[in-house]
């Protein structure tokens, strides 16, 4: 990872609140904080149709890792998709490491935007600028090509795995 603006957060959490805020994300956040991993989690409950806030670009920019939890309704949110475009732009520049988590969705469904994601993009296409929708699709495709983890029956094991991986990488970066 190339050097960039001073790191304020070790981790930026990107997730669809409706799907994961009160279960998986709350457990993951608690474990990261317990391990003294500085973590940014947007605690705002968003209204349907609310747009991505430019203020969120800053926490992304000053984070080492982005843990992106794509769940069934992630792509239904223009906010989440705008956030993902920003994250993937920083990833492309080498200024953030993206850790994909496929929560209750198959990576291939995300990569090819099939199944429920196809329906979500059909809705976006009817009300959004085609260029914006194309950016969202490309960001999701690029994201799904990264090596990541899939949720299973045991969220606690996945939480431990993610926290261990970040702790180990954080230690490596500290020695560079």
From Swiss-Prot:
Tissues expressing this chain: Mostly present in shoots.
Biological processes annotated in GO: defense response; signal transduction
SMART domains named among the record's database cross-references: TIR (SM00255)
Gene Ontology, cellular component aspect: cytoplasm; mitochondrion; nucleus; plasmodesma
Signal sequence interval, chain numbering: none
Highest taxon listed in the record's lineage: Eukaryota
Residue span(s) of domain TIR: 7-170
GO molecular function terms noted in the UniProt entry: NAD+ nucleosidase activity, cyclic ADP-ribose generating
SUPFAM superfamilies associated with the record: Toll/Interleukin receptor TIR domain (SSF52200)
Keyword entries, A-Z: Cytoplasm, NAD, Plant defense, Receptor
Cell location: Cytoplasm
Function, in words: Disease resistance protein. Resistance proteins guard the plant against pathogens that contain an appropriate avirulence protein via a direct or indirect interaction with this avirulence protein. That triggers a defense system including the hypersensitive response, which restricts the pathogen growth.
Subunit structure: Interacts with MED37E.
Protein name, UniProt field: Toll/interleukin-1 receptor-like protein
Source species of the chain: Arabidopsis thaliana (Mouse-ear cress)
The gene coding this protein: TIR
């Amino acid at each position: 990872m190339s050097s960039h603006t001073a790191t304020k957060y070790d981790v930026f959490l990107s997730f669809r609140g409706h799907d994961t805020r009160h279960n998986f994300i709350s457990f993951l956040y608690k474990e990261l904080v317990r391990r003294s991993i500085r973590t940014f989690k947007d605690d705002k409950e968003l209204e349907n149709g609310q747009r991505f806030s430019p203020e969120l670009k800053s926490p992304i920019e000053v984070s080492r890792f982005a843990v992106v939890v794509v769940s069934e309704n992630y792509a239904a949110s223009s906010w989440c998709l705008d956030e993902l475009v920003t994250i993937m732009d920083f990833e492309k520049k080498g200024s953030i490491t993206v850790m994909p988590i496929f929560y209750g969705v198959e990576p291939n469904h995300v990569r090819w935007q099939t199944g429920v994601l196809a329906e979500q993009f059909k809705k976006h296409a009817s009300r959004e600028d085609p260029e914006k929708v194309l950016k969202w699709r490309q960001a999701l495709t690029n994201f799904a090509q990264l090596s990541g983890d899939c949720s299973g029956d045991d969220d606690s094991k996945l939480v431990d795995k993610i926290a261990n991986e970040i702790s180990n990488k954080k230690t490596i970066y500290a020695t560079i």
